[in-house]
From Swiss-Prot:
InterPro entries: NADH_UbQ_OxRdtase-like_20kDa, NADH_UQ_OxRdtase_20Kd_su. Keywords: 4Fe-4S, Cell inner membrane, Cell membrane, Iron, Iron-sulfur, Membrane, Metal-binding, NAD, Quinone, Translocase, Transport, Ubiquinone. Binds 1 [4Fe-4S] cluster. NDH-1 shuttles electrons from NADH, via FMN and iron-sulfur (Fe-S) centers, to quinones in the respiratory chain. The immediate electron acceptor for the enzyme in this species is believed to be ubiquinone. Couples the redox reaction to proton translocation (for every two electrons transferred, four hydrogen ions are translocated across the cytoplasmic membrane), and thus conserves the redox energy in a proton gradient. This is NADH-quinone oxidoreductase subunit B. GO terms for molecular function: 4 iron, 4 sulfur cluster binding; iron ion binding; NADH dehydrogenase (ubiquinone) activity; NADH:ubiquinone reductase (non-electrogenic) activity; quinone binding. The keyword Iron-sulfur applies. Its cofactor is [4Fe-4S] cluster. HAMAP family: NDH1_NuoB. It comes from the Bacteria. One of its GO terms (cellular component) is respiratory chain complex I.
Length: 194
């Protein structure tokens, strides 16, 4: 068997594109003004000038530590987002077991009146700045059990919520999109209070 000229050419892998939006065919975040500004500055000067506030905000969005508060079936989908198919850690979003080491709390499931003080206590133990993602219909507004005497009609009555992820249960893709929205929100509003 001889080698043909086409067989001697090395195979070149395609460049990774990240998460591609199926409706546009472009990577998610390609239209983000934050990245456009950085790319234009790098192309123009070859280096980036920034402020300490912007640097801290950039570092914070790339190293968010989340704590689970899984209360019902949404917690199963929340676990899926850490598995290899979605691998949320590639976005700098890693799980932690302690609220004292967490920046983000994901409330997933039905919050009852009896569990509400525990939720608030865990939230108060988190260091500032802290963020909350409400995941699923039950956490957002009581869901299927909305009219029950024992259910809190939304975890936003107990803790301030930054991102709402709708669905019953929401898919892992929806939670991943919520994480990306939280990172975008942090970049937009910053984290340093004066």
């Amino acid at each position: 068997m001889g080698l043909t000229p086409s067989a001697t050419k090395p195979e070149i892998a395609q460049a990774p594109q990240g998460i591609v939006d199926p409706s546009t065919g472009r990577p998610v975040g390609a239209d983000d003004p934050f990245f456009k500004e950085i790319n234009s500055e790098l192309a123009d000067k070859g280096f980036i000038l920034t402020t300490a506030d912007d640097l801290i905000t950039w570092a914070r969005t790339g190293s968010l530590m989340w704590m689970t508060f899984g209360l019902a079936c949404c917690a199963v989908e929340m676990m899926q987002v850490s598995m290899p198919r979605y691998d949320v850690e590639r976005f700098g979003f890693a799980p932690r077991a302690s609220p004292r080491q967490s920046d983000v709390m994901i409330v997933a499931g039905t919050l009852t009146n009896k569990m509400a003080p525990a939720l608030r206590k865990v939230y108060d133990q988190m260091p500032e700045p802290r963020y909350v993602i409400s995941m699923g219909s039950c956490a957002n507004g009581g869901g299927y059990y909305h009219f029950s005497y024992a259910v809190v009609r939304g975890c936003d009555r107990i803790v301030p919520v930054d991102i709402y992820v709708p669905g019953c249960p929401p898919t892992a893709e929806a939670l991943l999109y919520g994480v990306l929205l939280l990172q975008k929100k942090i970049r937009r509003i910053g984290t340093i209070e004066r």
